[in-house]
């Protein structure tokens, strides 16, 4: 039915559209809904939420994060957004998605208005169809329906196309909005309607009444009779913007209606510092009016009237009038596919116009500084990088009181908001700082032979030698939750490996992170590489950071399994090092020592239950049930107040069992433990492979053959024999500290220290060598001789 409305416009409304509207309003089951709308509603995943809404009353929002509070919103749809690529007809799928997003926001209690193009394109299609119908049969057969574009069609006057297309365009909008129980109303205006005071009052009153009745006004310039543009002033000489196109119309409408937000959708990502498509063009995230001189404009779009310069002029005028503005791409949304709702949710989409000059560098600028700073860091001598890390270790102990005071502020603000395990992670202490300093000095000692180490030397041919050497990965983004002690650890590893570093901590640790970052930069300053480590503003969304694929080479999440999964999902194009879960197992064999078991279980589960290497599932050999050893384990867990969850097999052995576990694949992160029964070591291995996360798994036994079988067959990053799961840690492994624990199977696995932050490059030194010299009749032959690797002096 939409295709009929789209084809014939408003005239055949009674014949084609009315029966469908009637059947949808009374919900007759035998009526078929339009395929376009049915498809849109089936894939829709826009969250229907209610947020606190407030009018800005003439003052624009200062930050993107505030846009979610916008109540009155104007969405301007450019010609390139609503029309097809052939400039003849509308992009129905794109338009349906836009209507859906506007409807969702309207149903949240917002007041939505549309300024739309498309009447000319709609009318052009209808008039071309009329020309085809006016042909003779012979002409029609000769040209063919699919060759309509190649016909000798006279140039169609834009005003005539607009007149022919307005009714059909509005009928299409009505049909789409009806699916969301929303009414739409059309308003056609010209520049004179804004210059005549009486007409302005009438327009203003009409729009307010429509909004009051929960109707979406659809506004367009009356292109059928549009007069030439007026000067940019009203009758009293006050500076206004003349309605020359829909960009200026949207800005004028937004200011007249005291709108909170104006969204201008075009066919480009936003405002660039140079014409899009040029090699050095960079998208401007936040545009401050004072930066206008730094922008170079290109040509306008294929079908638009104004181009980017007109959009920026209109946006700045609206901003001056108290309306926040975002210019974004409405043709190929880059985030979730829902550009309008993404903008309202405060996501980094397009260019946000703000009267508040950004405080400090943008995250893109921080990425560039980390890149250049990291390259400078990599060129330092190993002794200089070690000196920086030693100085940072000294600062952690010398500035202990200031660090603990900042951490106390974080703890006070987090009290009652964070769960006890997270509060424990957030807390710093003198002993933690001392351990940090010791770990940093270990990193400094190991950094002497890291960057530039020769791994392989090969003589390819005479006077042609190849070397493989270690080099930094580039720029690392480390995202961590509630762990301020993670900051100096990761910073030291990045310094030792010559990597640039972006740090994104949780807002719950803002005070602690700030002082620790200042101390890190103070240490870096002794060799002039202060910018190598950057602390990203807490306003930056993690999802936005994960899209900076041109600035970030590796993402390392440190936090909950949900955080890791979210980052792995969002980071398209950037490798992620980490583990999504830490489901660690301990298998107690039938030949386990009674004296060892309780010590190992207590340490693995109770020493630090919030850690990712804490024990989560205890596997017991069935022969140990109802034995003193089993009773001893249970008694110890009761004393430690550990809540026990029974696995299915374990529950079947008990008359009165603890609560049966909901899932055998659970990371508790607290004093909770799953106990399950297995038949033998192979059964334990099968259980671990089915329900584990390939993190850390342990066997407790006195049988060496059984232990070796377990060690060789369990496919996890860390596999231990008669040792606590808590040893799975970079510091305890002698790595100095760890940047994280990886369960992936490439590059790095297990606790990742300094070595995991390095990659390699190949250096080939020759003397006028060319490949043709090695052909069948060439003068040279390949030798491929392995050469000794020189030992570096690390004293």
Swiss-Prot record:
Function: Bifunctional enzyme that converts glutamate to glutamate 5-semialdehyde, an intermediate in the biosynthesis of proline, ornithine and arginine.
Single GO cellular component term: mitochondrial matrix
EC number per UniProt: 2.7.2.11, 1.2.1.41
UniProt similarity note: In the N-terminal section; belongs to the glutamate 5-kinase family.
Binding-site residues for ATP, renumbered to this chain: 266-267, 305-311
Annotated keywords: Amino-acid biosynthesis, ATP-binding, Kinase, Mitochondrion, Multifunctional enzyme, NADP, Nucleotide-binding, Oxidoreductase, Proline biosynthesis, Transferase
Positions of region (Glutamate 5-kinase): 1-361
Gene this protein is translated from: ALDH18A1
Keyword Oxidoreductase: yes
Catalytic activity: L-glutamate + ATP = L-glutamyl 5-phosphate + ADP; L-glutamate 5-semialdehyde + phosphate + NADP(+) = L-glutamyl 5-phosphate + NADPH + H(+)
GO molecular function, one term: identical protein binding
Region (Gamma-glutamyl phosphate reductase): 362-795
Disulfide bonds: none
Modification type N6-succinyllysine: residues: 311, 347, 550
Organism: Pongo abelii
Protein name: Delta-1-pyrroline-5-carboxylate synthase
Binding-site residues for substrate, renumbered to this chain: 117, 223, 246
One protein family per Pfam: Aldedh
Cellular location(s): Mitochondrion matrix
């Amino acid at each position: 039915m939409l295709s009929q409305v789209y084809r014939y416009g408003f005239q055949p409304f009674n014949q084609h559209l009315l029966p469908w509207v009637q059947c949808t309003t009374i919900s007759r089951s035998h009526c078929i809904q339009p395929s376009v709308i049915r498809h849109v509603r089936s894939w829709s995943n826009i969250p229907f939420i209610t947020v606190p809404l407030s009018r800005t009353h003439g003052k624009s929002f200062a930050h993107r994060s505030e846009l979610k509070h916008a109540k009155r919103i104007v969405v301007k749809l450019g010609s390139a957004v609503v029309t097809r690529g052939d400039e003849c007809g509308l992009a129905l799928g794109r338009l349906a998605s836009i209507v859906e997003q506007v409807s969702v926001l309207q149903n949240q209690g917002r007041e939505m208005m549309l300024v739309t193009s498309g009447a000319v394109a709609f009318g052009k299609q209808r008039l071309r169809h009329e020309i085809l119908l006016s042909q003779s049969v012979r002409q029609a057969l000769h040209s063919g329906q699919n060759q309509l574009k190649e016909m000798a069609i006279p140039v169609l006057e834009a005003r005539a196309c607009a007149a022919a297309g307005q009714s059909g365009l509005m009928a299409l909008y009505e049909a789409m909005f009806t699916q969301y129980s929303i009414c739409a109303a059309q308003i056609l205006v010209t520049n004179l309607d804004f210059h005549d005071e009486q007409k302005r009052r009438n327009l203003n009153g009409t729009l307010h009444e429509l909004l009051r009745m929960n109707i979406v006004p659809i506004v367009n310039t009356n292109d059928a009779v549009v007069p030439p543009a007026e000067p940019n002033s009203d009758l009293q000489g006050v500076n206004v913007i003349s309605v020359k196109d829909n960009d200026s119309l949207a800005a004028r409408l937004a200011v007249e209606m005291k709108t909170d937000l104006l969204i201008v959708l075009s066919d480009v990502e936003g405002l660039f510092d140079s014409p899009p498509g040029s090699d050095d063009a960079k998208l401007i995230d936040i545009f401050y009016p004072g930066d206008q001189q730094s922008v170079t404009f290109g040509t306008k779009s294929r079908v638009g009237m104004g181009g980017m310069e007109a959009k920026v002029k209109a946006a700045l005028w609206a901003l001056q009038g108290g309306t926040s503005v975002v210019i974004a791409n409405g043709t190929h949304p880059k985030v979730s596919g829902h550009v309008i709702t993404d903008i309202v949710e405060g996501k980094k989409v397009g260019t946000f116009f703000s009267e508040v000059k950004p405080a400090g560098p943008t995250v893109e600028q921080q990425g560039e500084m980390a890149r250049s700073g990291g390259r400078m860091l990599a060129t330092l001598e190993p002794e200089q990088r070690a000196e920086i890390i030693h100085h940072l270790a000294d600062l952690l102990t010398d500035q202990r009181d200031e660090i603990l005071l900042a951490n106390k502020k974080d703890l006070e603000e987090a009290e009652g908001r964070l769960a006890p395990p997270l509060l424990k992670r957030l807390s710093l202490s003198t002993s933690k700082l001392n351990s940090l300093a010791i770990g940093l000095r270990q990193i400094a000692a190991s950094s002497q032979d890291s960057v530039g180490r020769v791994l392989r030397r090969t003589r390819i041919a005479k006077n042609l030698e190849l070397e493989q050497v270690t080099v930094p990965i580039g720029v690392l983004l480390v995202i961590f939750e509630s762990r301020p002690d993670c900051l100096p650890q990761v910073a030291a590893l990045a310094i030792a490996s010559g990597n640039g570093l972006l740090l994104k901590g949780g807002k719950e640790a803002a005070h602690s992170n700030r002082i620790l970052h200042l101390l890190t930069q103070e240490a870096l300053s002794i060799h002039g590489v202060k910018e190598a480590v950057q602390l990203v503003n807490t306003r930056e969304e993690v999802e936005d950071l994960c899209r900076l694929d041109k600035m970030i080479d590796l993402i390392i999440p440190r936090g909950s399994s949900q955080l890791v999964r979210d980052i792995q999902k969002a980071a398209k194009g950037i490798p992620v090092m980490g583990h999504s879960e830490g489901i660690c197992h301990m298998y107690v064999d039938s030949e386990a020592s009674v004296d060892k078991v309780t010590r190992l279980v207590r340490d693995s589960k109770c020493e630090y239950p919030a850690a990712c290497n804490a024990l989560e599932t205890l596997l017991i050999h069935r022969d140990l049930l109802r034995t003193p050893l089993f009773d001893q384990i249970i008694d110890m867990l009761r004393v430690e107040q550990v809540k026990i969850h029974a696995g299915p097999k374990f529950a079947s052995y008990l008359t009165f069992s603890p609560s049966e576990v909901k899932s055998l694949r659970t990371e508790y992160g607290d004093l909770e433990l799953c106990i399950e029964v297995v038949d033998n070591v192979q059964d334990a291995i099968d259980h671990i492979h089915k329900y584990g996360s390939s993190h850390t798994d342990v066997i407790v036994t006195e049988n060496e053959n059984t232990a070796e079988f377990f060690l060789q067959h369990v496919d996890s990053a860390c596999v231990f024999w008669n040792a606590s799961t808590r040893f799975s840690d970079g510091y305890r492994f002698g790595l100095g500290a760890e940047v994280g624990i990886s369960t992936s199977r490439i590059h790095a696995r297990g606790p990742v220290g300094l070595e995991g932050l390095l990659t390699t490059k190949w250096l080939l030194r020759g003397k006028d060598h060319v490949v043709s010299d090695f052909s069948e009749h060439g003068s040279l032959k390949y030798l491929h001789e392995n050469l000794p690797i020189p030992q570096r002096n690390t004293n």
